[in-house]
């Protein structure tokens, strides 16, 4: 099962993802408290997503993360808690800009490919960093 978690602001995007992913997906964005989100994430095999509260919750409850990072701040500054995570981040000429709005259409994030994320996820699963018996 694929699950989207997040706040109320993530509900519409979560619904787009749920539709794209098909019947094995659930959109729980905007429906759960932080404690509820942590419990759902604790039951997951892995978290795949960007640097958000959900990523930090996943790391705190021991769920391995494929964490997608922009290059706006310093490497390692906001990575998920604990060991056994895969961090995807690409350096660009504007790395360390600290800008909230990117004038280059999020170039550093767009350099991260779906294939790259899938390879990282498979590496987590194969390495045994995943939790067994979880969805």
Could you tell me what each predicted segment is?
Residues 18-20, 24-28, 59-131:
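Nucleotide-sugar donor-binding patch of glycosyltransferase catalytic domains
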Residues 1-68:
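Donor-binding and catalytic core of enzymes assembling or modifying cell-surface/extracellular glycoconjugates
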Residues 133-135:
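Intrinsically disordered, low-complexity segments enriched in serine/threonine/proline/glycine
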């Amino acid at each position: 099962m694929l699950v989207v978690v997040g706040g109320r602001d993530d509900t519409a995007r979560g619904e787009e993802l749920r539709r794209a992913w098909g019947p094995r997906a659930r959109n729980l964005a905007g429906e759960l408290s932080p404690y509820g989100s942590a419990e759902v994430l604790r039951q997951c095999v892995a978290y795949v997503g960007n640097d958000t509260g959900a990523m930090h919750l996943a790391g705190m409850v021991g769920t391995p993360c494929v964490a997608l990072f922009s290059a706006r701040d310093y490497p390692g500054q906001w990575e998920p808690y604990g060991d056994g995570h895969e961090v995807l981040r690409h350096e660009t000429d504007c790395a360390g800009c600290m800008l909230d709005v990117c004038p280059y259409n999020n170039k550093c994030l767009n350099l991260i490919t779906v294939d790259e994320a899938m390879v990282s996820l498979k590496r987590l699963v194969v390495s045994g960093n995943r939790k067994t018996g979880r969805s």
